């Protein structure tokens, strides 16, 4: 072999092993682990210590298994072209239905309690409008009965005087009882008006409320005289009814047999036994159908009006309070079985002499809690005491919060809400300042100054029924005569008069279809997607994987911190050893640098050959050690053969 070829063969032999040219599998695997970009395999080879090497083997094999699993799922999903469609019909639970008469109590049962209030109300109406109310025989009797007290001082008008202001001049007002003008020193608070307005648009009607010492007063005005008088009447009405026991109020209201004339559900007859009494402070006796306190929850398997709830209600217009309510009919609210029916807030009114059809669509919503939204899954994270015997809702929280503020600031509870534990309802005798306190607190609540709106949260899961209401005249002119005659005969035990169509109302509640709409919130970025996105970015830009991240943690955190700690430990040990060692005399300093006359700093640094020819420093002695035996040096095995072929013999 030529000398050049021999040299090339020697160099090639000593170069790193490449792939298939490796002499055996062990060296091939060693070469792969040292040169691959798969960091885990490299860490298996270069790691020192059996435990660390074993951990890297475990991490790498786990990562390989996960890669095969994920790739198999992706390939299987790619080649799957079939689709699966499920059509599922099921029975839907029928909601609870609460029905109330708009008039809470029979007028004949409560007129003796409200006689003085009605007398002063009629006097105020006569002063404002200049007319006296013409009523039926029963109401004329009540009016003549209350006129006996004509010579007495007005009780309710003194507590909260009704006044009429001229627009633009709030310093003087006309008193409703005396008809005279008087000076008013009070804050004017204007309440939003409804539809009706007084005949003289130049006047604004309101009533005055003062604190105990009458030093602080406020006048609440309405641009509608009807609204002002009804609000004033309602305020005193709540004060009177708050002093009546619950048992007496239930007896003064309508029974289930009186309110419900006929009942059908899902084509099957029902009666008052299928309804549960619910007494509302402002609506009297209400009755709830399909309440689970009675029996199991009813369900329906078909949509349409024939498979829902059908009832005929007896309204009894003659027993209506003329000042408390100005319309006739009933209120109905659809809700869950464990939910409190807020009749005054979300109730639907039912007209008399009409058939009201309510079609329902069920929507079930599920929201994500913190940190995605400010909703609550239960009452645990809301610092408000639940005064309702029902599950959590935003309305329950707001009303409970206001009632708690009412008890805290006014010393009593507001009549239209449930009574908190240990509190009493407000009334004049025990709490003479409650009216003024209530209105002041209500204004602060509307302006969101009580903090209730910030504390209360929406519920994360709830059911909602979307209602579609339609009306039809009922009964028709051709069927009115025979239908009313039969209903009068059927209800002769409960109703002692002949029925007319203005006393009745028909109600139909049903599912329009059995499709349930579900709205569910899911995180837009889950933890799996987050890890996938981060891994994709690391792999794209840095060729890094989970194993690479573990390697970085090992090198830059574990090993680096260990080295720093070891260095600091040795440094501290050296400092402590020097401190404890005895002081030694300092050796004379040898001439170096510019002190050495043999060194010229302007010249270039000497090479190894030129350094041997430099003269020794002054005063230095050449050591007497004999020169080394150069033939005893041993070179690396990898270069021994090369030196044999290429070395040149120099003469000694």
UniProtKB/Swiss-Prot annotation:
Region of interest called Gating release of inhibition by proteolysis (GRIP), as start-end residue ranges on this chain? 137-224
Topologically, how does it sit relative to the membrane?
Answer: Multi-pass membrane protein
- Organism's domain of life? Eukaryota
Q: Does the keyword Ubl conjugation apply?
A: yes
Give disulfide pairs as residue numbers: 100-286, 210-217, 263-270, 375-460, 397-456, 401-452, 410-437, 412-426
Keywords recorded for this protein, A-Z: Cell membrane, Disulfide bond, Glycoprotein, Ion channel, Ion transport, Membrane, Phosphoprotein, Sodium, Sodium channel, Sodium transport, Transmembrane, Transmembrane helix, Transport, Ubl conjugation
Q: Any idea what job this protein has?
A: This is one of the three pore-forming subunits of the heterotrimeric epithelial sodium channel (ENaC), a critical regulator of sodium balance and fluid homeostasis. ENaC operates in epithelial tissues, where it mediates the electrodiffusion of sodium ions from extracellular fluid through the apical membrane of cells, with water following osmotically. It plays a key role in maintaining sodium homeostasis through electrogenic sodium reabsorption in the kidneys. Additionally, ENaC is essential for airway surface liquid homeostasis, which is crucial for proper mucus clearance.
What is this protein called in UniProt? Epithelial sodium channel subunit gamma
Record lineage: Eukaryota, Metazoa, Chordata, Craniata, Vertebrata
What's the encoding gene here? SCNN1G
């Amino acid at each position: 072999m030529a000398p050049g070829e021999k040299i090339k063969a020697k160099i090639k032999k000593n170069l790193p092993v490449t792939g298939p040219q490796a002499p055996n599998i062990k060296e091939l695997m060693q070469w792969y682990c040292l040169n691959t970009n798969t960091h885990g395999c490299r860490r298996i080879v270069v790691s020192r210590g059996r435990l660390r090497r074993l951990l890297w083997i475990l991490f790498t094999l786990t990562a390989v298994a996960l890669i095969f699993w994920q790739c198999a799922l992706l390939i299987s999903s790619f080649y799957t072209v079939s689709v699966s469609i499920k059509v599922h019909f099921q029975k839907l639970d029928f909601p609870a239905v609460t029905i109330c008469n708009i008039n809470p109590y029979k007028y004949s049962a409560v007129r003796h309690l409200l006689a003085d209030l009605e007398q002063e109300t009629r006097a105020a109406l006569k002063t404002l409008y200049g007319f006296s109310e013409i009523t039926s025989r029963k109401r004329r009797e009540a009016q003549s009965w209350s006129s006996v007290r004509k010579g007495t001082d007005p009780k309710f008008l003194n507590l909260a005087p009704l006044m009429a202001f001229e627009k633009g001049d709030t310093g003087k007002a006309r008193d409703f009882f005396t008809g005279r003008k008087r000076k008013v020193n009070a804050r004017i608070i204007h309440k939003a008006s409804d539809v009706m307005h007084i005949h003289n648009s130049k006047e604004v009607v309101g009533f005055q409320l003062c604190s105990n010492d009458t030093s602080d007063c406020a006048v609440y005005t309405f641009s509608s005289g009807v609204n002002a008088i009804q609000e004033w009447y309602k305020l005193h009405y709540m004060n009177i009814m708050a002093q009546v026991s619950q048992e007496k109020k239930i007896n003064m209201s309508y029974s289930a047999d009186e309110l419900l004339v006929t009942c059908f559900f899902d084509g099957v007859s029902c009666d008052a036994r299928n309804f549960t009494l619910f007494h509302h402070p402002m609506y009297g006796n209400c009755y709830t159908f399909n309440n689970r306190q009675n029996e199991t929850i009813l369900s329906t398997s078909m949509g349409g009006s024939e498979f829902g709830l059908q009832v005929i209600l007896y309204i009894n217009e003659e027993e209506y309070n003329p000042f408390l309510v100005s319309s006739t009919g009933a209120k109905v609210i659809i809700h869950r079985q464990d939910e409190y029916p807020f009749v005054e807030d979300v109730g639907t009114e039912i007209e008399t002499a009409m058939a009201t059809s309510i079609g329902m669509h069920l929507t079930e919503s599920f929201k994500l809690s913190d940190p995605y939204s400010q909703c609550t899954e239960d009452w645990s994270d809301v610092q408000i005491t639940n005064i309702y015997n029902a599950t959590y809702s935003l309305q329950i929280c707001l009303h409970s919060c206001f009632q708690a503020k009412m008890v805290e600031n006014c010393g009593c509870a507001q009549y239209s809400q449930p009574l908190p534990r240990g509190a009493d309802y407000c009334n004049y005798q025990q709490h003479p300042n409650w009216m003024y306190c209530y209105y002041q607190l209500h204004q602060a609540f509307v302006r969101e100054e009580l903090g209730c709106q910030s504390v209360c949260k929406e519920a994360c899961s709830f059911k909602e029924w979307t209602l579609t209401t339609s009306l039809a005249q009922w009964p028709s002119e051709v069927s009115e005569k025979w239908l009313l005659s039969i209903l009068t005969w059927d209800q002769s035990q409960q109703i002692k008069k002949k029925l007319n169509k203005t006393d009745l109302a028909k109600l139909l509640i049903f599912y329009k279809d059995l499709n349930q709409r579900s709205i569910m919130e899911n995180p837009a970025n889950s933890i799996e997607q987050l890890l996938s996105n981060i891994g994709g970015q690391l792999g794209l830009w840095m060729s890094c994987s989970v194993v690479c991240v573990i390697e970085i943690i090992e090198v830059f955190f574990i090993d680096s911190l260990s080295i720093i700690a070891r260095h600091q430990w040795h440094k501290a040990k050296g400092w402590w050893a020097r401190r404890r060692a005895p002081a030694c005399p300092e050796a004379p300093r040898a001439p170096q640098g510019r002190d050495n006359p043999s060194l010229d700093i302007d010249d270039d640094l000497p090479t190894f050959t030129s350094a041997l020819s430099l003269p020794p420093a002054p005063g230095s002695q050449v050591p007497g050690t004999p020169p080394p035996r150069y033939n005893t040096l041993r070179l690396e095995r990898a270069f021994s053969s090369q030196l044999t072929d290429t070395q040149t013999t120099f003469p000694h």
